[in-house]
Amino acid sequence: MVAYPILINNAGIFNPKPFLEVSPEEYDSFLDIILKGKFFMAQAAAKAMQKRGGGVIVQTGSLWAIQAVGATPSAAYSAANAGVHALTRNLALELAGSNIRINTVAPAVVETPVYGTFMDAAQVAKVLPTFNAFHPLGPNGPPADVAQAILFLASDEASWITGTVLPVDGGVTAGRP
């Protein structure tokens, strides 16, 4: 049983916008919330974990940092999440000597309230089903599947896993049908 601190480092925004239309302020928002926030949360947690003899950090990244998706132009979002993925690998090396593991889950399209932050409910109901065919395993992912991946990475069953970015994507990174 895990007997040390665990941080689920989950903060983000999502607002697809073409690269040529992203303002400096919008870009900064992606970096501040997705990357900078996770960087300093991980730093604060790691300091506390060192005092306790170890710990686990599981971050949320995104499939969009692994594979561009033309239907949702998201260069700023993707770049910030690519930073999270790089942070994961770097911290895995830096923190391993302190018995701190860090991993990231990279979900594809998961049906969460985030879509309601830039579309009204009618648009969400119309648009989300169009992504069902995007995943080789079928419909958009349920949040519970991402939660189960996070729970696994935080558990003792994953005690020898660190620095990993785990796609939770219904098979998207394997290829497209």
Language-model segment annotations:
Residues 18-19, 26-31, 127, 131:
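Substrate-binding pocket helix/loop in short-chain dehydrogenase/reductase
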Residues 42, 80, 88:
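Active-site helix of classical SDR
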Residues 47, 93-97, 159:
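Alpha-helical segment proximal to the catalytic Tyr-Lys
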Residues 62:
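Residue(s) in the substrate-gating loop at a strand-loop-helix junction
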Residues 66, 102, 107-117:
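Short, flexible catalytic-loop segment of classical short-chain dehydrogenase/reductase
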Residues 135-146, 157:
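A conserved structural motif in NAD(P)-dependent oxidoreductases
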Residues 150-151, 162-177:
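Short C-terminal tail/terminal secondary-structure segment
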